[in-house]
Amino acid sequence: MTLNNTTKGYFFAFLSVFATSNVYIFSKAALSQADIATFGLYWFGFGLIWNVLFATKTGKIKHIQTLNQNNFLILLILGLLEIAGTTFFFMAIRTVPNPAIVSFLGNINPVIVTLLGLFILKERYNKPEVIGILLILLGAFIISFKGGAKFSSMFITGAEYIMYSGLFYGASAIIAKKNVQKLTPTIMALSRTIFLFVFSFSAVLLLSRSWTLDWFPLWNIIIGSVLGPFLTVISGYQAIKYLEVGRVSILGSTKGIVVLIGAYVYFGKFPETYQLLGGLLSISGVILISVGKLLLKKKKV
């Protein structure tokens, strides 16, 4: 049976949501007992193995020979952006007690992508997008606000890492979308993992961190590395290859619900009622932004 491109896109988008959601769970479990540099060494080390095996098995690794100097420059830029974004992401995972909160706050990413699209790609806004942005910002404020007399103590610790991560991921997403057809999802995923592994290896070496792990974090890393550096990245790039980014974002916004369930089952943790409300507002905002982008695209056709 041959699947059309739209069906393939939805399949990869759902696969990406499942894999991404579980990354929050297994990385949180591993980081509870591992230094972030050592964690990265093993996480991306295993991820590199899975990516190389997949690229070799499918024959996609041969595509490297067709890349030109400009392609390698794009991969370098993406690699540096991913190093920054991923480092801040795992700092947030380690710092914020409940991974579901990180997932909900991560819905700020579509706002960043939309704003970057306005300034870099000269894209336009419409009413659903504006309302969506406001809902996400309101949701993020509700989730992260904890009160206090000083601005520095008003928000939960770790919220700033999610913002930094979103900025770098947003820039990476725009560049990746413009180059995914040329570079292919497999090569982009492989390149990303190589950059992150080399960075983690260097961090362990320069910071004199431990080279070994106990069995509990190692087991969670093995599972998570299949879902994260391998399955999440490849399926995510495949999804934007076949679908509009707006449709992928709508499906991706549901990951917070999956993480919420997973965090409760795995850690016995559940967000406060106001944080859950903020999370639902942010999900609604992502959906509105995505719908707005799709409406704009239909008007152009």
Task: Report the location of each language-model feature.
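Specific transmembrane alpha-helical segments of multi-pass solute transporters/efflux pumps
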Residues: 19-23, 59-100, 142, 225-243
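Hydrophobic/small/kink-forming positions within alpha-helical transmembrane segments
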Residues: 18-21, 25, 79, 83-87, ...
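Structural motif at transmembrane-helix junctions in multi-pass transporters
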Residues: 32-38, 87-106, 183-186, 235-254
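Hydrophobic alpha-helical transmembrane segments of multi-pass integral membrane proteins
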Residues: 7-12, 37-57, 72-77, 132-135, ...
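Glycine-/small-residue-enriched transmembrane alpha-helix faces in small-molecule transporters
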Residues: 1-42, 88, 151-178, 300-301
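Alpha-helical transmembrane segments of compact multi-pass small-molecule transporters, enriched
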Residues: 46-50, 105-119, 195-202, 251-266, ...
